[in-house]
């Protein structure tokens, strides 16, 4: 799996912005990716040193629109903690 296939998109929420103060950045990642693959992908794409990776799997919620039933998509979220000597991720720095 390529690094750009593993990292799907960043998560921009109030909570993720607060975590950036602790050098933690949040991403939606491929459901099949493990912590080692996520770490390598972030280091390759953003050129930073990763200290730790936390992952969470979210199940899709059932939704209904009139008589039509369905589910929201299941996804995997990763919180990546950068090493103390590493620089921040430039993409997120402009958002603070």
Curated annotation (Swiss-Prot):
It comes from Caldanaerobacter subterraneus subsp. tengcongensis (strain DSM 15242 / JCM 11007 / NBRC 100824 / MB4). It comes from the Bacteria. SUPFAM superfamilies: Ribosomal proteins S24e, L23 and L15e. Gene3D superfamilies: 3.30.70.330. One of the early assembly proteins it binds 23S rRNA. One of the proteins that surrounds the polypeptide exit tunnel on the outside of the ribosome. Forms the main docking site for trigger factor binding to the ribosome. This is Large ribosomal subunit protein uL23. HAMAP family: Ribosomal_uL23_B (MF_01369_B). NCBIfam families: PRK05738.2-4 (NF004363). One of its GO terms (molecular function) is structural constituent of ribosome. Belongs to the universal ribosomal protein uL23 family. The keyword rRNA-binding applies. The gene is rplW. GO terms for cellular component: ribonucleoprotein complex; ribosome. Keywords: Ribonucleoprotein, Ribosomal protein, RNA-binding, rRNA-binding. Part of the 50S ribosomal subunit. Contacts protein L29, and trigger factor when it is bound to the ribosome. PROSITE patterns: RIBOSOMAL_L23. GO terms for biological process: translation.
């Amino acid at each position: 799996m390529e690094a750009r296939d593993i990292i799907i998109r960043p998560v921009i929420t109030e909570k993720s912005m607060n975590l950036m103060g602790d050098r933690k950045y949040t991403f939606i990642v491929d459901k099949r990716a493990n912590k080692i693959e996520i770490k390598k992908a972030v280091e390759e794409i953003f050129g930073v040193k990763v200290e730790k990776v936390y992952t969470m799997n979210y199940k899709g919620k059932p939704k209904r629109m009139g008589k039509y039933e369905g589910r929201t998509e299941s996804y995997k979220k990763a919180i990546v903690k950068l090493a103390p000597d590493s620089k921040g991720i430039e993409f997120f720095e402009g958002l603070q």
